[in-house]
Amino acid sequence: MNKSIVILGGGTAGWMSALFFKKAYPQSKVTVVESEEIGIIGVGESTTPYFIEMLDFLDINVLDILKASDIAFKTGVKFDGWGKSIFYHPFNLNDEHYNHDTALIQYYLKNKNTNVFKTLNPLVAITEQGKIQKIKKNLPHNDFAVHIDACKTSIALKSIALSRGIQLVQGVVGSVDVKDNNVASLILNSGYRVCGDFFVDCSGFNRVLANKFNIKFLKFNDLLTNTAIPCPIKKTFFEPYTTAKTLNYGWTWKIPTHSRTGTGYVFSRDYTDTDSAKKEFYTYLKTVTDEEINLNKIIFFETGTLEKIHFNNVLAVGLASHFLEPLEGTSLAISVIILFEFIKQKEDFNNKVLQKILQIKDFIVLHYLTKKTQSNFWLDASKKARENNLIQKLLSSKTLNFDLFKDNDHYFSFLNHLNFLQNLDAIDTNTSVSTEHYKTDFNYKELLKSKAWHYSHVKNAVDYKTYYEQFL
């Protein structure tokens, strides 16, 4: 790898990238160019297990930075108002039994079980009881994630990075010097020049380096939201999950950390004005807390991705590379995917990452396949979802088609999609699975084994609040 790597931008994405490149290429000089004048947007506070995998790769134990980063544990997402009733999208338990014999899934489907995940994954029952699985030092990567305070996590990662020899240059980039169609240096407003062999664009929505090379931004027109009103509140909730609750023109997030709760309203300005959205969000927040509410910060965004994540001698990471609304907390996950895929140095890197982002986008679109009629926003969002190619294939199959996901390279599995199709009441629940890919017959002993496994996990779960406070 190149001798000198320059990261443009701090924040979680910037310092995470710096640590990643230093670990992957220990002989390289890594420099972060950061400006306190610009600051960070502070999104991406609900993560997925990919964040834990990244920390593990960087030799950072999440338990060691828990206090500094105001981290709280997360086992999934609670959806309120999206379907006929509240439902959960839990992470998968890291247990070989969760690679369920497909005959078991067939059994539950044929018996019209409306929530396969609730039956097959004990994390739902555990979460509903306000409990959590005990988390061990040798942490598995797919059964839990964390809620973070983006600013505090950025500071914690920065501290670790500086202790590992990563350099910091403070200042605002005024111009970019390009030679032979590659970035040669970043020129700060002070006149100081930061030279490098390879550059990582973590400049957020500004996309400084991507714009310098006129990299095309692919808009996701089947996702309608374009505005967010973030509002952290002091009240805390000992809930090991993110809550996504629908309002008239979008949805709200609730992300509890140790010392506060991140909340926000994601909506579309094409269906309501910002002042009306503030009033609606304010009314909702007053049902959650009685504290003073500040709704002055507004984030305008465009959903989509760069056509090329790696171009010339530049790699785009974080908001500089893409943006998807945070329904499943995939922002940092996609950044981790970009970094891991990049160090593999495959020729099809751009296409592989683009396909992964598109797959995740399709899954986010699936969330809007609702029967909500409270506004034109929800009617149009549902219409857009039904026009999505993957969703059309899922809905048009006479039987639920596992083969759509048989390459096993999807970030979200068939069961993830099935969970939403059923809970959003988008398909009949008396469906069965019948493909050449799965031929096993139902075995009653396997059903008993499944129930015993399910019960043992629920039985061994502990009170979340008590367990969490042991770490503080």
Predicted regions: what is each one?
Residues 2-11:
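Beta1/beta-strand and adjacent pyrophosphate-binding region of the FAD-binding site
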Residues 14:
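N-terminal Rossmann-fold NAD(P) dinucleotide-binding loop
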Residues 22-43:
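Glycine-rich FAD pyrophosphate-binding loop
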Residues 39, 43-128:
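Dinucleotide-binding Rossmann-like beta1-alpha1 core, especially the glycine-rich loop
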Residues 139-277:
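Predominantly flavin-linked oxidoreductase catalytic cores and closely associated redox partners
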Residues 266, 295-351:
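A conserved active-site cap/scaffold subdomain adjacent to cofactor or substrate pockets
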